[in-house]
């Protein structure tokens, strides 16, 4: 296992150990530790790596080097995508074929599905998954979607394919929440496919943490979150952690208790915002967490965008023509666009604050990007795909269509909230990136 020198330095600082103390605790020569701090390619024997982890009270994996450093773009040809095909059996029939699109190893990747369940059969539901998703009909046929045991207008709907002259907008799309059971069948005799953009879930770290909690602790958490998370329930948790009641908190903030109760009933009102902001300043918490989400979903959690909705969203973006897929304010990191490319020369630069996943649906397109060793490019045809990292400058040219998806896997809205609270954010990031500075007491 290669040791990441920056992770090693971070944990030495976090544990408040000097290099000499760390080496002594791990039973390593000090010069060996210094070599690990200075050389990313240095790979200690397993016993030394384990000893270092034990000395710093961490798991060895918390010191392991990542394989993704300096990664800018990952791409996959149509042939490579087709080679990833795996047939799925469900309900006694060949139900789907799955194909994986480009993504770095160890990260969530979008998939394309051949829909094979015939139209005269009710498609058997799956169990849902943690990752929310944007699902888009790629055509050429329509698709039946199912989202519940009982068939209702909310649990059964057709995802239409675009049969018009603007087929670069491939079809209907919808946003699907975590753990929503779903399934699809053909809506006629025409074949059909979907792309399922399963994005990284922002609550995935919480679920990983909760897996290690005791059953009693987890049940207490569920009590606090029962029903719809509200300003009052969250505030009560914040106050208990600070040894406050609503009465004492209101007194500390100079707010009448009745005004606080009114603010919790209507947190987004002008008075509610003023009261909660005053309370946050007095007690030291971010009042924005208490504001209600702007939910945009039906009774099973879906948010739908029809072909006509996408057509109405058409606009020029640099050298591209764009149209929107389904989106929802309560899942702000989950984004998707249809992108029409028609540029013989260099296309307009694209540079996003989070990862992008692309899949080509028509034409032969060239993706160019600024790599760590200079300009790079790849030519992709339909079913070719690519992943671009955050803040990687890239562009498309040629004539065709590419579907553009994004998630919050890198710099998501939670990160932006944190950065708005960070003193000198640029300086903090500059210092923290690849930081090998000791904590100041080695000498």
From Swiss-Prot:
The keyword Cytoplasm does not apply. Binds 1 Fe(2+) ion per subunit. It catalyses: 2-hydroxyethylphosphonate + O2 = hydroxymethylphosphonate + formate + H(+). InterPro entries: Cro/C1-type_HTH (IPR001387), Lambda_DNA-bd_dom_sf (IPR010982), RmlC-like_jellyroll (IPR014710), RmlC_Cupin_sf (IPR011051). This is 2-hydroxyethylphosphonate dioxygenase. Residues 8-63, 234-290 form the HTH cro/C1-type domain. GO terms for molecular function: DNA binding; ferrous iron binding; identical protein binding; oxidoreductase activity, acting on single donors with incorporation of molecular oxygen, incorporation of two atoms of oxygen; protein homodimerization activity. The gene is hepD. Mediates the cleavage of the carbon-carbon bond of 2-hydroxyethylphosphonate (HEP) to produce hydroxymethylphosphonate (HMP) and formate without input of electrons or use of any organic cofactors. Reaction was initially supposed to follow a Criegee rearrangement with a phosphorus-based migrating group. However, it was laster shown that it is not the case. It comes from Streptomyces viridochromogenes (strain DSM 40736 / JCM 4977 / BCRC 1201 / Tue 494).
């Amino acid at each position: 296992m290669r040791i990441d020198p920056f992770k090693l330095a971070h944990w030495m600082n976090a544990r408040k150990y000097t290099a000499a103390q760390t080496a002594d605790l791990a039973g390593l020569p000090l010069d060996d530790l210094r070599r690990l701090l200075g050389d990313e390619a240095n790979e200690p024997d397993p016993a030394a790596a384990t000893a270092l982890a034990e000395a710093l009270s961490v798991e060895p994996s918390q010191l392991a080097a990542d394989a993704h450093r300096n990664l800018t773009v990952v791409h996959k040809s149509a042939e490579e995508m087709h080679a990833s095909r795996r047939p799925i059996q469900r309900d006694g029939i060949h139900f789907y074929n799955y194909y994986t699109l480009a993504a770095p190893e160890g990260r969530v990747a979008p998939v394309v599905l051949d829909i094979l369940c015939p139209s005269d059969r009710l498609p058997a539901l799956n169990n849902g998954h943690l990752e929310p998703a944007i699902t888009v009909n790629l055509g050429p046929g329509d698709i039946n979607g199912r989202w519940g045991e009982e068939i209702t207008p909310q649990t059964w709907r057709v995802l239409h394919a675009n049969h018009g002259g603007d087929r670069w907008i491939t079809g209907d799309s919808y946003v699907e929440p975590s753990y929503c059971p779903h399934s699809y069948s053909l809506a006629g005799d025409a074949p059909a496919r979907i792309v399922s953009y399963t994005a990284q879930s922002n609550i995935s770290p919480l679920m990983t943490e909760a897996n290690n909690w005791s059953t009693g602790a987890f049940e207490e958490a569920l009590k606090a979150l029962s029903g719809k998370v509200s300003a009052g329930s969250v505030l009560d948790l914040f106050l208990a952690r600070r040894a406050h009641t609503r009465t004492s908190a209101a007194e500390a903030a100079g707010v009448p208790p009745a005004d606080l109760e009114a603010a919790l009933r209507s947190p987004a009102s002008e008075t509610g915002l003023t009261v909660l902001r005053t309370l946050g300043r007095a007690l030291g918490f971010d009042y924005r967490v208490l504001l209600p989400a702007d939910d945009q979903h039906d009774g099973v959690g879906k948010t739908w965008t029809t072909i006509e909705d996408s057509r109405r969203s058409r606009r020029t973006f640099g050298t591209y023509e764009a149209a929107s897929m389904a989106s929802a304010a309560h899942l702000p990191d989950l984004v998707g666009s249809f992108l029409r490319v028609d540029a013989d020369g260099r296309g307009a630069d694209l540079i996003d604050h989070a990862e992008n996943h692309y899949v080509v649906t028509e034409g032969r397109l060239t993706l160019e990007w600024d790599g760590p060793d200079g300009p790079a490019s790849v030519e992709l045809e339909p079913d070719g795909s690519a992943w671009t990292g955050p803040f990687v400058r890239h562009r498309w040219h040629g004539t065709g269509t590419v579907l553009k998806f994004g998630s919050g896997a890198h710099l998501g809205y939670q990160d932006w909230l944190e950065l708005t609270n960070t003193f000198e954010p640029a300086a903090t990031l500059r210092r923290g990136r690849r930081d090998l500075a000791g904590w100041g007491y080695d000498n």
